[in-house]
């Protein structure tokens, strides 16, 4: 620093201009003069020099601070106009830093917003008085009938500025008119709109608006004349816009060109199909009518508006839709009730679970069991058992729903017919009904009818003496069919047993056509020991009851001269039944009957030697029965 004899001193000042916290400009150096009576230059002296160099207002747009040492480091000390600027202690230099002042009025963002507002103000239309349009006076029209046409025109004129428009506003109006009316400029017919609205309200059941439409008939004619006069002046009226954008649905304009096929969303019909287990297995069918509908088949395409609200209102459309739906339904699907006849002498408990076989053979002839409302052909091919229950206090005829009646169709049962021509030897069984220990409990029974063809019987059973069967007879016996042995069964109560599935013989396999699985019914615990009665009888006098044996786990009883044998009350639940044939008694104990399987039609005896034959026998069981009914002639 050089001193002079003048009244001013000159110093060199280095300053840095910064427009941001992290952005610094290249340093500049200027010479500053200050009076000699001052100890150091001030910020006012620096600004005076910068005004002469950079122009007026430049120094005031920055905030200034000088660099000084502080505790072994450097800091920036802010100064004002009258503050002194101190040099660095090491070098004696004057270093200043200028930061741009953040003024809200001069902010770039605010300047951009202000500029954008000015551009928008130039585009907005003005009224005749030169002022901007008042948007608070523009209202959306919800109902055309409630607003006078003159008022609607006045609002549009005020919004569009009357006849004073610039070129940009005119182009926008023409584009909006093209979007609203499509390729045609036809005037909407208010009478057709009133008829469509009346049809729509008749479907929804609104009676209040129906009276309003009838009273506004004369008003619609005057409204049509006003629309024709002022249509050119109100091209963008919200009441005439398309209904797809949330506008009015009653004044939807017609469309001169419609697609030949339109997607129509109709109702969805839920129909419960016939719950036959052999066909449907209880599935539900939902049929939806979301299909393509040809607009030419419904009516004239010119008279059909494009509004989705008024489309279902055309005459004949709902009727045709219902007729098409009605023709698709089958008779079994329309049936909702079924009548089930209850047996007056048979009451069966409701099953808790059920099983059925996959294949069941059937013969030809009249049915012996009731299988629900099916034809004879369907019962022969896909016959399913029907388990039903009736109370002693209820009437003999019980009406149930189709779902409840067919719900038990999964229960397996054998329904076979009797061939009267090829049947000569017949064994039958009657109802065996036993009273329960509980007075309020229902009686449980099983009825089995067995038909044994003559060619299936052994020679000694027919002639009374033993004869060795021929080769042809063995072939006939080995190939049993449903016509030679036919049985009819009814549901019965399953007897609880602890036997496992491993004790079942080969003749009781589920794949066997004569071994269906019976329903499982739970019964209450009783104090008395269960009693099992096995009854068998034949019409042939050569076959006596001496050839019949009844056995249990712990005891075996044989009877002679009787056609029916009853086990004592303390007999075990697991009983064996065998039919002994002369000279073949040693094989009789090999074939067992397990009551826990509850098979009412099965191969009870299966002999494996060359002289042995297969004979099917039916067993009648009754639980808690103290006595048996009288046996009829030729049967039990």
Swiss-Prot record:
PANTHER family (alphabetical): PROTEIN SOSEKI 3, UPSTREAM OF FLC PROTEIN (DUF966)
Stretches the record annotates as Disordered: 164-188, 281-304, 340-393, 499-524
The family this protein is said to belong to: Belongs to the SOSEKI family.
Keyword annotations: Cell cycle, Cell division, Cell membrane, Developmental protein, Membrane
Region described as DIX-like oligomerization domain: spans on this chain: 9-103
Assembly behavior: Homodimer. Forms long polymer filaments with other SOKs proteins polymers crucial for polar localization and biological activity.
Domain statement: The DIX-like oligomerization domain is required for polymerization, edge localization and biological activity.
Localisation per UniProt entry: Cell membrane
Other comment: 'Soseki' means cornerstone in Japanese.
Membrane topology according to the record: Peripheral membrane protein
Gene Ontology terms: cellular component: plasma membrane
Biological role: SOSEKI proteins locally interpret global polarity cues and can influence cell division orientation to coordinate cell polarization relative to body axes.
Entries under Pfam families matching the protein: SOK
Principal location listed in the UniProt entry: membrane
GO biological process: one example: cell division
Entry protein name: Protein SOSEKI 2
Lineage top rank: taxon: Eukaryota
Feature: compositional bias, Polar residues: 375-390, 499-510
GO terms, molecular function: protein homodimerization activity
């Amino acid at each position: 620093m050089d001193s002079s004899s003048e009244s001013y001193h000159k110093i060199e000042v280095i300053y840095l201009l910064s427009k941001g916290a992290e952005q610094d400009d290249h340093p500049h150096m200027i010479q500053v003069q200050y009076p000699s009576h001052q100890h150091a230059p001030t910020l006012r002296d620096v600004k005076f020099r910068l005004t002469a160099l950079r122009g007026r207002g430049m120094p005031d747009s920055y905030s200034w601070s000088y660099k000084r040492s502080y505790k072994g480091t450097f800091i920036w000390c802010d100064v004002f106009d009258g503050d002194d600027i101190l040099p660095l202690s090491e070098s004696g230099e004057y270093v200043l830093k200028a930061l741009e002042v953040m003024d809200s009025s001069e902010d770039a963002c605010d300047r951009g917003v202000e500029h954008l507002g000015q551009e928008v103000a130039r585009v907005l239309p003005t009224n005749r008085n030169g002022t901007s349009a008042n948007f608070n006076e523009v209202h959306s029209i919800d109902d055309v009938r409630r607003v006078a046409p003159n008022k609607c025109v006045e609002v549009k004129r005020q919004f569009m500025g009357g006849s004073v428009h610039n070129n940009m506003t005119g182009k926008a109006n023409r584009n909006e008119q093209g979007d609203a009316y499509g390729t045609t400029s036809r005037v909407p017919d208010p009478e057709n709109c009133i008829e469509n609205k009346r049809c729509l309200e008749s479907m929804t059941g609104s009676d209040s608006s129906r009276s309003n439409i009838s009273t506004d008939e004369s008003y619609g004619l005057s409204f049509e004349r006003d629309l024709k006069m002022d249509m050119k002046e109100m091209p963008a009226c919200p009441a005439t816009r398309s209904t797809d954008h949330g506008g009015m649905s009653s004044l939807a304009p017609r469309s001169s060109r419609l697609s030949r096929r339109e997607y129509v969303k109709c109702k969805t019909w839920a129909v419960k199909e016939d719950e036959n287990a052999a066909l449907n297995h209880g599935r539900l069918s939902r049929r939806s009518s979301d299909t393509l509908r040809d607009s030419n088949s419904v009516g004239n395409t010119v008279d059909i508006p494009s509004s989705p609200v008024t489309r279902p209102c055309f005459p004949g459309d709902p009727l045709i839709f219902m007729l098409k739906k009605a023709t698709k339904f089958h008779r079994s699907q329309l049936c909702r009730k079924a009548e089930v006849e209850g047996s007056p002498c048979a009451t069966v408990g409701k099953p808790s679970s059920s099983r059925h076989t996959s294949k069941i053979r059937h013969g030809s002839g009249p049915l012996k069991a009731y299988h629900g409302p099916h034809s004879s052909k369907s019962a022969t091919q896909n016959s399913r058992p029907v388990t039903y229950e009736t109370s002693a206090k209820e009437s003999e005829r019980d009406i149930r729903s189709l779902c409840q009646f067919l719900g038990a169709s999964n229960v397996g049962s054998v329904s076979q017919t009797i061939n009267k021509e090829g049947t000569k030897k017949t064994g039958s069984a009657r109802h065996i009904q036993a009273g329960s220990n509980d007075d309020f409990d229902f009686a449980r029974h099983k009825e089995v009818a067995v038909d044994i063809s003559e060619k299936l019987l052994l020679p000694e059973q027919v002639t009374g003496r033993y004869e060795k069967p021929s080769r042809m007879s063995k072939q006939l016996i080995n190939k049993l069919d449903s016509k030679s042995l036919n049985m009819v069964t009814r549901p019965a109560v399953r007897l609880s047993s602890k036997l496992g599935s491993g004790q079942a013989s080969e003749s009781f396999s589920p794949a066997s056509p004569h071994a269906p699985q019976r329903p499982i019914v739970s019964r209450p615990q009783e104090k008395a020991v269960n009693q099992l009665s096995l009854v068998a009888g034949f019409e042939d006098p050569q076959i006596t009851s001496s050839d019949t044996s009844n056995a249990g786990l712990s005891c075996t009883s044989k009877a002679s001269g009787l056609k029916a044998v009853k086990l004592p009350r303390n007999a075990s639940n697991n009983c064996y039944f065998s039919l002994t044939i002369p000279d073949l008694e040693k094989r009789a104990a090999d074939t067992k009957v397990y009551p826990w399987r509850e098979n009412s039609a099965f191969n009870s005896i299966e002999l494996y030697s060359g002289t042995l034959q297969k004979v099917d026998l039916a067993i009648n069981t009754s639980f808690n029965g103290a006595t048996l009914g009288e046996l009829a002639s030729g049967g039990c």
